[in-house]
Amino acid sequence: MSDKKRVLVKFSGEALAGGNGFGIDTHILKYIAGEIKGLVLNGIEIGIVIGGGNIIRGVSAAKDGIIKRTSGDHMGMLATVINAIAMREALEYSGLSVRVQSAIKMEAICETFIMGRAQRHLEKGRVVIFAAGTGNPFFTTDTAATLRAIEIDANMIIKATKVNGVYDRDPMKFEDAVLLNEISYERAMEDNIKVMDDTAIALAKDNKLPIVVCNMFEEGNLLKIANGDYTNCSVVKN
């Protein structure tokens, strides 16, 4: 591994939809590309995982029993590939060098995930977008992001959301909701605090990988966090 900081950023698929609620908003892509470029220009190596909820969710697709859960999850994996290609285009348009690596082999579209190759791309200053989740049904893209972060020896995983971090209650419903600046892995799981799913948190805990939850729409926020400024976000760690 290089001596540079290495961060994995996780975006939800819904974030790409903007106010539309579905599909991909190119204005959001352009904004995210600008934030990622700021990280790269400051010498930070970047991996990215994007969910697929702006297109389809495996659980939702399978809820009435017509589509099997495994098939629904495979559809969700393909949705993440669509988002990864869109993000690659936006990042390349901004002048960055980018590679997409998929957990499912699809050579005509992108590389297949190989840990060593991904690390070499990062060392050369390329942004690597990891698509298709873990390649297995029943695992979320949060778990996939945590797994890839560990595999590439990332210093942290940043979960970029629409809110400043994790609250003791839903800030959209309760005006007195309090931002939790620091939480232990154990509390996040025991209190069912919606940071990530329990599998992802447990994996991060076992590998001492900090999870930082932040507002992606605060300009420059990702760079501040990557440089150690956690004043307006939530950090999950031991």
From Swiss-Prot:
* Top-rank taxon: Bacteria
Q: What is its EC number?
A: 2.7.4.22
Catalytic activities: UMP + ATP = UDP + ADP
User: What is its pathway?
Assistant: Pyrimidine metabolism; CTP biosynthesis via de novo pathway; UDP from UMP (UMPK route): step 1/1
| Activity regulation remarks | Allosterically activated by GTP. Inhibited by UTP.
GO CC terms of this entry: cytosol
Disulphide bond pairs: none
Q: Which SUPFAM superfamilies match?
A: Carbamate kinase-like
Q: Which Gene3D superfamilies match?
A: Acetylglutamate kinase-like
Where in this protein does the record put region Involved in allosteric activation by GTP? Answer: 18-23
Compartments annotated for it: namely: Cytoplasm
Please list the residues that bind UMP: 52, 73, 134-141
Q: What class of enzyme is it?
A: transferase
Indicate yes or no for the key word Kinase.
Answer: yes
Which controlled-vocabulary keywords does the entry list? Allosteric enzyme, ATP-binding, Cytoplasm, Kinase, Nucleotide-binding, Pyrimidine biosynthesis, Transferase
GO biological process per UniProt: 'de novo' CTP biosynthetic process; UDP biosynthetic process
Q: How does it assemble?
A: Homohexamer.
Q: What family is this protein classified in?
A: Belongs to the UMP kinase family.
Name-wise, this protein is Uridylate kinase
- The gene from which this protein is expressed is pyrH
